[in-house]
Amino acid sequence: MNYLLPSAAIVLLVLVSLNIWFYIKVRTLKTELQFLTDQNLEITNNNQLLNQEKIAYLQKIEQLKCRVEYQEQSIKDSEKIRNESFSSAKAALFDLGKDLSKQLIEIHKMENTAARELAEKNIATASGKFNSEFERLITMVGTLNKDIEQSKSTVDLIKQSLLSPIGAGLLAEITLENILKSSGLRSNLDFIMQYGLTTSDSTKLRPDALIFLPSGNLMVIDSKASKFLVDEQDNSGNLSKTMNYHLKSLANKDYAENILADLNKKEQNYNNVITLMFLPTEQAVEKVIAADPNFLQKAWGCSIFPVGPSGLMNMLSFAKFQITDHRRSENYKIIIEEVRKLLSSIGTIADYSQKIGNNLHNMVTNYDKFAASFNRNFMSRVKNIQKLGIDSGNKTLPASLERYQIVSSKSEIIEVEAENSQPQQIEE
């Protein structure tokens, strides 16, 4: 019996739980039922309101329907009246249009005739111009074709010339000369093209350009080129070999010492020499660096500076600035010397002007004495003779000579003290 007690307790507990669940479920259902009842009541009220609104709208619809029928009847009456008016107007317009059509047809015929004649005339003129222009165009095309063929042959000739070593060298020299001329430097004063000299061992050197810089500085430019620079094919090995040969040749020529020695013989003192290797294009510089990345370091090690047109223009701008500044300094000294000469000339002119003034004073004084004596002695006797009945004929004698006097005075110079009372001396 004891083992049945737990089972009975469990069953009892289950029954109690079921009762509680049923109770809760019933309460929930009652609540939902109450909610649904209230909601149903609300829906019923809404339906009644909607039915009332429906009745009101139906009444309005009936009223609007009556109005529409009245308006339709009015429209029909208006349409009937309009049709009758339109028929009357149509008949009148038809008669008027018939007359206008006749007139317009006559005018149109006349205009068509005139327009056809004018069009035929314009077409004939345009055809003549077109034919002449077409003939001229054919002639121009033929001439242009000949020019293109000649230009093609010329371009081929230039290309072949540039692909030769001599042509490439001439291109670099021409480019260098054009840059120097356009830089603002003075030919044969600030720079010299194709300067030739002979060394002590009878070796002839000819740098392409010498630029004379202030303070005893000298810039030597030697243009170098290779046919591989203008060739579109990839010849990096040949280009590197050629440009390294040019660099070695330029370094072995020792322009610096030989040019300094040659210029010193001509009593031109220069102490420092800058050597530039000029390449005709910036693309040429890039090609050389791409062919031999160590080319610039090799050149700098030999105190040689490879440059293209842009680099050369920058260096020439700086050189022009130095030359202009040096020229301004020299002109400054010349101006001071000229001012000294001018001041000396002013002193000489002042002496001469003083002498001229003294001479003028003496001349006017003597003239005044002469006029006084003439008026007092001579003219009085002339008047006495005229009183005796002797006239001068057609000539009218003056009553007296005018007298002049010179008033001399010393100029007073008013000196105004400036902020800096001591004048600044110009340093020579």
From Swiss-Prot:
One of its GO terms (biological process) is DNA recombination. Keywords: Coiled coil, DNA recombination. It comes from the Bacteria. Residues 25-80 form a coiled coil. InterPro entries: DNA_recombination_RmuC. Belongs to the RmuC family. Involved in DNA recombination. PANTHER family: DNA RECOMBINATION PROTEIN RMUC. This is DNA recombination protein RmuC homolog. The gene is rmuC.
